[in-house]
């Protein structure tokens, strides 16, 4: 098998690979490379190998995809993603690892790094202290918040992850099942926070809405529920520039393997006692490129909005860390009309 097993995976039949991934999704075969390399390599991918020119996926436009690779033993398992103002991304791994990178125009990584999450690898700490699943960021203060699904906690970190500045272990969160806790954390631009649990009660996820920083005692908390598309579970979420939420939902099934759906949620429906449900705008399933999609982030450039997805490879040789970029076109109904020429200037 060649480097990283990439070509071996490309040669496998899509259906057979999907079935294998479904079986190995929970406990993959971890690949250990004995190196602390900070390098992250990119390999461009297409959305559909049988139709490389395909770009339209539901309401989104495919812009590009890349497989991320590194020989660092801690690289992988990315379960959430956030975009920074300087153009880079930070992903958080479910083994307590921070993975940062940007993309250059020649499809190389910009200032990559792989580092342990502070205060998660001490002698008195175990996997539950490292099972980080969600990440949120305040671009003004530089602070980060990370959710942990096993010990049902939210930790706040100072700018640059220099130190831990607070921790929340809310009673309502402690009632969530082990390893099915805070899967998704979203910071809204008005300062409120949303936390959605991985566990499903019937067809909805329990969720919490905080009036402010969840770590601060003055923040009021209210409960609501999120209904994912049938057969799917929430993995991550972010807020669009227009204020709506974009929620990433994933399905693992045999023999079909992985699938993902992106849903839009009206933020006004996120309120105490309510069930918030989204409208699916795009679906990914074989033969389209898809893996264990767990992270989502939003960027803007020259007025265009982009949705980024990233997959959790479960440290398995049978899966990949895939980064995908889609443009989210503006709704024609809300697009501002073009200005008309003034009288006498329409011929210019």
Protein language model regions, located:
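Sequence/structural signature of beta-propeller domains
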Residues: 2-339, 346-348
């Amino acid at each position: 098998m060649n480097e990283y097993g990439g070509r071996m995976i490309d040669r496998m039949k899509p259906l057979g690979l999907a079935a294998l991934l479904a079986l190995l999704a929970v406990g993959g075969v971890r690949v250990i490379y004995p190196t602390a390399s900070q390098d992250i390599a990119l390999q461009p991918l297409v959305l559909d190998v049988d139709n490389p020119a395909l770009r339209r996926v539901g309401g989104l436009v495919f812009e590009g995809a890349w497989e991320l690779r590194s020989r660092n033993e801690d690289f992988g398992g990315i379960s959430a993603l956030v975009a920074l103002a300087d153009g880079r991304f930070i992903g958080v791994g479910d083994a307590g690892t921070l993975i940062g990178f940007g993309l250059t125009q020649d499809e190389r990584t910009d200032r990559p790094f792989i580092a342990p999450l502070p205060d998660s690898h001490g002698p008195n700490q175990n996997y539950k202290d490292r099972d980080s699943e969600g990440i949120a960021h305040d671009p003004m203060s530089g602070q980060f918040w990370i959710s942990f699904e096993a010990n049902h906690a939210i930790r706040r970190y100072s700018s640059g992850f220099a130190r831990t500045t607070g921790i929340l272990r809310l009673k309502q969160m402690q009632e969530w099942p082990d390893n099915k806790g805070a899967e998704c954390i979203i910071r809204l631009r008005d300062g409120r926070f949303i936390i959605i649990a991985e566990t499903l009660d019937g067809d909805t996820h329990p969720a919490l809405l905080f009036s402010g920083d969840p770590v601060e005692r003055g923040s009021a908390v209210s409960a609501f529920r999120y209904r994912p598309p049938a057969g799917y579970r929430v993995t991550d979420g972010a807020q669009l520039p227009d204020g709506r939420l974009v929620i990433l939902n994933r399905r693992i099934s045999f023999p079909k393997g992985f699938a993902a759906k992106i849903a839009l949620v009206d933020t006004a429906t996120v309120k105490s006692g309510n069930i918030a449900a989204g409208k699916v705008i795009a679906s990914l399933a074989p033969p389209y490129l898809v893996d264990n999609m767990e992270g989502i982030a939003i960027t803007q450039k020259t007025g265009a909005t982009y949705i980024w997805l990233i997959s959790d490879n479960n440290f398995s040789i049978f899966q990949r860390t895939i980064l995908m970029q889609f443009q989210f076109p503006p709704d024609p109904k809300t697009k501002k009309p073009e200005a008309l020429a003034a009288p006498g200037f329409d011929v210019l």
